Regions:
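Hydrophobic, well-ordered beta-alpha structural blocks that scaffold small-molecule cofactor pockets
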Residues: 617, 627-706
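Glycine/serine-rich phosphate-binding loop and adjoining beta1-alpha1 elements at the start
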Residues: 485, 519-659
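Conserved phosphate/anionic-ligand binding catalytic regions in large, soluble enzymes, centered on
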Residues: 468-496, 527-552, 591-600, 625-643, ...
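Non-catalytic interaction/regulatory segments
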Residues: 25-33, 42-481, 486, 501-512, ...
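N-terminal mitochondrial targeting presequence
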Residues: 1-44
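Non-transmembrane, aqueous-exposed alpha-helical and coiled segments at domain scale
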Residues: 550, 648-662, 679, 697-711, ...
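Terminal amphipathic helices with adjacent charged low-complexity linkers/tails
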Residues: 280-283, 551, 555-558, 584-585, ...
Length: 1017
């Protein structure tokens, strides 16, 4: 399908309307490099005063005049036919000749022929015209311009090869952008593309026209866009625009062009613009436009780390750019799915520890920690560097479409060689993982010319071999230039957010190792949580390289999010050109907001998918702006509404008054859950912590001040200290050596923040986690939640502290708003000590309920109806339909929460020794299994039943606009079936409990069929 920009329909986002046709005659026009093209005679360029250059260099009395004259002539003769004389002053040329003389002197003394000169704003490099020498200098130049972090300054680079092909020179400069003027260059007036002073001076009108076109296309593109023109027979001009990265692309571009047999890069330039776009221009001899386009599309996907083994192999020519990009993705796969080394000792210990609580889990944790270095990507790269020929075989198998016979032959060849070389068993396992990658890929976009990231749809059955408790329905692996990601869903129709993980350097390695496991856990939790909606559980993750970004940057993060979206769309839009598809089935994906992907991101994703021509764009993302039909969770407190329903149900059962309870909360007033928990609760807040600060007041934190912060979404650091009682305190994360009112010295504010939920200042009746990293409380540290000396998680699990009084508990009630804040075993340990605990999958499902009903409206309403009824400027300025629909969603959230809570409580009253956590899991598992059974049955042949359930499920306000019979025509059949399966399963399980049997289900369905028949009359 032809790609369209998110803001408007365009034929293509590249420099030509479609992939280049070999028969297409390219016009002979001006290139970006020179005012016309490489001139055929010196007449096209101003005369260079050789005598003046010789005189100026000789005057420095460093080199003999004859040598100066000889090399000056060599220099001028080599470059005077290029645009070099146009771009440099006489003084600069003198410096360059001086550099050439220095390089020659080094060479005559037995050193390498090269010269490097750098100061604060300018740099000059010279070397032999040899691939490795040029790459070395290019890397230095790229590092030089990448050091500039001043947003008011831009960079320029120039690259020339002498006419006799003997030497190459590189120059770089850092300088201000021009003042803002009303020129046609500014395709986006709100963010003008101001060029550097050098670019403004050097670019001709034709070149500016090319640049304007690229800048315009870059506005709606999430990958590099380029323009290719033939400037003369056998000579091609290549111009590319991309979002400004921390590392300059010029090295990678040169390296991939050098792969083309007979091709030579003659000149190159790059200019940065004030709107964070970088322009690159190259003039290449001996290459066809098709060859250049093919390779240029991969430039943003090459490994970007200078000392990465794959980068070195590519630059040395041992691997092509296609092989390098492919094996980089295969290494990502291998990192997460290569089985951990096992030995007889491991198997023996596993058998012994199998009878101990949590024993095998602890053994596996120990194995993981001991094998981290061996299973690292660095080690994998080192092994690949020894056997690049294996990569070529594995890539060829992938390129041709992997076949079992070919994989077996390759595996035999690899195993034979590695045994000969006496390599470790793990090395053999690594290469087998690469072949496994080929085997499990059932859809990919590797062959697409236009792609923001690599996307692979994997057959998830291979996870059975890796001891995952449940095999997902679908797994996607994504490999971007500066990020990697996954998407996991446990059912065909599934829902979940996309989490963007941004790390400091010290945490990046840990996050990199755990990202798939975290994604899996979050998706599985979502599956259990989504028992009240048609969609099963899913989750997406985007892990950004810490060397690229270590804190949230909205522009860059949105750009990466849209790259993730673009790659996903490649695989779910039917009939996409260049996509290799062995799945042969249409998939529906729903993406919700999560950490670092809320705000404007969902709307951007929806509009982008609309621009790509995705029919279900209205439902593709949730959490969109109200103007696009989104129902923002934070504005209406959807998730909090569910959490509060559970808290109040507990108070009602235990006979407690909300206003008399003391509460502690993680997650501050600047977040969705944190702010709404503040605004919608009535307890006395005694402690709160967020990323910015730790706050405590035993008299109760001032409610009005908390409300002020929550309304304005401000972090705790903005809390006015004047609102604290004498015993209260506010410690900022960056504070050091702070003395608290009770005399305690806090040496490190960030450490206090991380441990605050364990300190005495957070003691309360109720704990509601509304933020924090997963597994903040585990079996290893949960003992700190007891006011008992030396309490530990293992003893808690064994029931040693089963008869504690409420005074011995740090918290008597815990309702998890944040996902996975407390590990499963820690939850059970707390309940065995008398804590009333409701886990995340039950408590915080309000958000997904809202998102699901938002999606359902998008599927039911036509585009015109959607714009009329679901487009709201704000919560107050919204259509009456929208307001009523939101209120009905809130009622549905509360209804679902009470249904599940009462089911959990009834089961617990039957056996008070059974943890509510395990009861909730049992109910969820039964629900999920019942849903799967219904989906695999022929129950949907009864159209009266389907119509009845759809009528029960749809909210009244929606049915007033779209009658049920119209819904049945518009909503996809598999989504209708998912609604029926969910509705039947959840109500059955909530009514009959964990121990119900087939006879109970028969009675239940008899009643449902009777109601359906009655409704059909």
């Amino acid at each position: 399908m032809m790609r369209r920009a998110a803001s408007q329909t365009v034929a293509s986002l590249r420099g030509y309307a479609s992939p280049v046709n070999p028969a297409l005659r390219l016009p002979v026009v001006a290139s970006l490099i020179s005012p016309g093209r490489f001139a055929s005679s010196a007449a096209a360029s101003p005369l260079v005063c050789r005598d003046a250059i010789v005189k100026a260099v000789t005057a420095k009395a460093v080199f003999d005049e004859k040598i100066v004259e000889s090399l000056a002539n060599t220099f001028v003769n080599g470059l005077e036919k290029s645009s070099y004389p146009l771009n440099f002053s006489q003084e600069e040329m003198v410096a360059h000749v001086q550099g050439l003389l220095t390089a020659e002197a080094r060479f005559r003394m037995g050193d390498s022929f090269e010269y490097v000169h750098e100061n604060r704003r300018n740099a000059f490099y010279i070397c032999r015209n040899e691939p490795q020498k040029k790459l070395r200098m290019l890397r230095k130049m790229a590092q030089f311009v990448s050091r500039n972090e001043d947003p008011k300054l831009g960079s320029n680079t120039h690259h020339y090869v002498s006419e006799d092909r003997n030497f190459a020179i590189y120059t770089a400069s850092i300088e201000p952008f021009i003042e803002n003027t009303n020129t046609e260059m500014h395709v986006d007036p709100e963010n003008p593309a101001l060029p550097t002073q050098t670019a403004e001076r050097q670019l001709t009108e034709r070149q500016k026209e090319i640049v304007r076109g690229l800048l315009h296309r870059q506005l709606s593109s999430v990958f590099p866009v380029f323009h290719i023109e033939e400037v003369s027979k056998g000579q091609v001009s290549f111009t590319m625009a991309t979002m400004l990265e921390r590392t300059n692309y010029v090295t990678w571009l040169l390296s991939i062009f050098q792969e083309i047999a007979g091709a030579e890069v003659m000149t190159g330039v790059s200019y940065s613009f004030a709107n964070r776009v970088q322009i690159y221009g190259f003039e290449i001899r001996g290459a066809a436009a098709e060859q250049i386009a093919e390779r240029a599309s991969l430039v943003g996907l090459l490994p970007s780390r200078p000392f990465n083994a794959l980068t070195r192999l590519h630059e040395a020519g041992a691997l092509s750019c296609e092989e390098t990009v492919f094996i980089d993705a295969a290494v990502i796969f291998a990192m997460y799915f290569t089985p951990s080394p096992t030995t007889d000792d491991y198997r023996h210990l596993k058998a012994i520890l199998a009878t101990e609580p949590n024993g095998v889990n602890r053994l596996n944790n120990l194995r993981s920690s001991l094998t981290q270095e061996v299973m690292s990507e660095r080690y994998t790269g080192a092994v690949i560097a020894l056997y690049p020929e294996f990569v070529k075989l594995i890539y060829e198998d992938f390129r041709l479409g992997s076949k079992p016979e070919r994989r077996a032959a390759i595996a035999e060849k690899i195993m034979h060689r590695l045994r000969e070389d006496d390599r470790a068993e793990y090395d053999r396992t690594l290469f087998m993982s690469f072949l496994k990658f080929n085997e499990v890929i059932i859809k990919h976009n590797f062959c697409k010319t236009e792609k923001a990231a690599l996307a692979f749809r994997l057959n998830p059955e291979f996870l059975k071999e890796l001891e995952f408790p449940r095999v997902p329905h679908g797994v996607f692996l994504f490999a971007g230039g500066q990020w990697r990601g996954f998407h996991i869903r446990f059912t065909d129709i599934a829902r979940g957010g996309v989490r963007m993980i941004i790390s400091k350097e010290r945490n990046y390695r840990k996050n990199k190792r755990s990202v798939f496991q975290e994604n899996y856990n979050l998706a599985y939790t979502q599956l259990l949580k989504n028992k009240d909606i048609p969609e099963g559980g899913s989750k997406g993750t985007i892990l950004i390289s810490s060397s690229y970004l270590n804190k949230f940057d909205e522009v860059r993060c949105r750009h990466i999010f849209l790259q993730y979206v673009d790659a996903m769309l490649d695989l779910i839009i039917p009939g996409e050109k260049g996509v290799v598809d062995r799945l042969k089935a249409e998939e529906i994906i729903f993406l919700g907001p999560d950490e670092n992907t809320a705000g404007t991101f969902p709307a951007a994703g929806a509009l982008y998918s609309k621009g790509r021509g995705y029919k279900a764009w209205k439902s593709f993302t949730t959490g969109k702006d109200p103007e696009l039909g989104g129902i923002p969770h934070d504005v209406y407190g959807m998730t909090t509404h569910s959490v509060r329903a559970y808290v109040r149900c507990i108070y009602e059962k235990l006979g407690l008054r909300e206003s008399e309870m003391r509460k502690f909360q993680t997650g501050g007033p600047d977040g969705d859950l944190g702010s709404n928990e503040v605004l919608r609760s009535k307890e006395k807040m005694v402690g709160m912590v967020d990323i910015s600060a730790s706050l405590h007041d035993p008299q109760g934190i001032d409610r009005e001040e908390l409300a002020r912060l929550a309304h304005h979404r401000l972090p705790l650091r903005e809390f006015r200290r004047s609102k604290l009682s004498p015993e209260g305190f506010l410690v900022l994360t960056e504070d050091r050596n702070v003395k608290l009112p009770d005399g305690t010295l806090v040496e490190d504010g960030s450490r206090m923040r991380d441990e605050f939920h364990f300190l005495k200042y957070s003691d309360a009746d109720v704990f509601v986690p509304c933020g924090g990293r997963p597994r903040s409380v585990t079996l290893e540290n949960v003992g700190k939640f007891l006011k008992v000396p030396d309490a530990d998680g293992e003893s808690m699990m064994e029931g040693k502290y089963a008869n504690l009084s409420p005074e011995q508990l740090k918290f008597t009630i815990i309702v998890e708003g944040a996902n996975l804040f407390i590990s499963q075993d820690a939850r059970v340990a707390l309940e065995k000590c008398g804590v009333t605990l409701i886990k995340d999958a039950s408590a915080n499902k309000g958000g997904v309920t809202s998102s699901s009903l938002e999606v359902f409206a998008g599927l039911c309403l036509s585009d015109e109806e959607h714009a009329k009824y679901m487009s709201a400027k704000s919560a107050t300025d919204a259509p009456e339909f929208y307001k009523r629909y939101v209120q009905e969603i809130l009622q549905r959230i509360e209804e679902n929460a009470k249904l599940e809570f009462n089911a959990i409580w009834r089961e617990w009253e039957k056996d008070p020794n059974q943890p509510k956590t395990l009861i909730a899991d049992a109910l969820s598992r039964k629900n999920v299994q019942m849903r799967a059974n219904v989906l695999s049955s022929d129950i949907f042949q009864n159209r009266d039943l389907v119509r009845y359930v759809m009528d029960q499920y749809a909210l009244k306000t929606l049915k007033e606009v779209v009658p049920v019979d119209v819904m049945l025509e518009r909503v996809p059949k598999n989504y209708q079936h998912a609604i029926c399966a969910m509705w039947l399963a959840s109500r059955y399980v909530y009514q009959t409990g964990v121990d119900s049997n087939e006879f109970d289900f028969f009675r239940y369905m008899t009643e449902v069929y009777a109601n359906a028949a009655k409704s059909a009359k």
